[in-house]
Amino acid sequence: MHRKLSFFSAFVLTFSFFISLPIYALDIKIDGVLDDADWSSAREWTKYYESMPFSLAEPKHYQKVLIQEDEKGMYFGFINEQPRESIRSNRHERDNEMANADKAGLAIDFDGDGPTAYGFTVSAGGSISDGIYRNENEVNYDWDADWDSATHIEGDAWFIEMFIPWSIAPMKSQKGD
């Protein structure tokens, strides 16, 4: 069984494309430490543009997102390299997009048709934000979904692990594989 998803980013990933993902059981512990064996076979994204503030500039520091999925949902591992003294790891209330903290996240168009996407963001301090994006510019932060995340700071990098269950949002029936 394969699912087709369109991924695009509200904050880190700034492009959209379709990928086909095979379904198999994974053993990833959401603890912010990307040391689980299943991460070694993950798909990777490494091309990003700065979107906050909106400049589309190349990022100053290396970033990578690892992607895995199984019958339960999707797993994302973020590697964000930057000097330790510059990492803003302040905790803040849920859905506070204006908080003074370093954040990384993504938005998923579960139907792959464009009008609606679900956003998931985690700060370096472990605070979360989620919302529904409609028509690319309308955001509703009243949607509080049940998903897992954890962060870890080590040396000159901070890490995020996320698990987003398939049941988190309604999806249209998919035709084909």
Regions found by a protein language model. Give the residues of each.
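Bacterial N-terminal signal peptides
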Residues: 9-22
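Structural preference for beta-rich elements and adjacent junctions enriched in aromatics
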Residues: 24-177
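N-terminal secretory signal peptides that target proteins for export/translocation
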Residues: 1-8
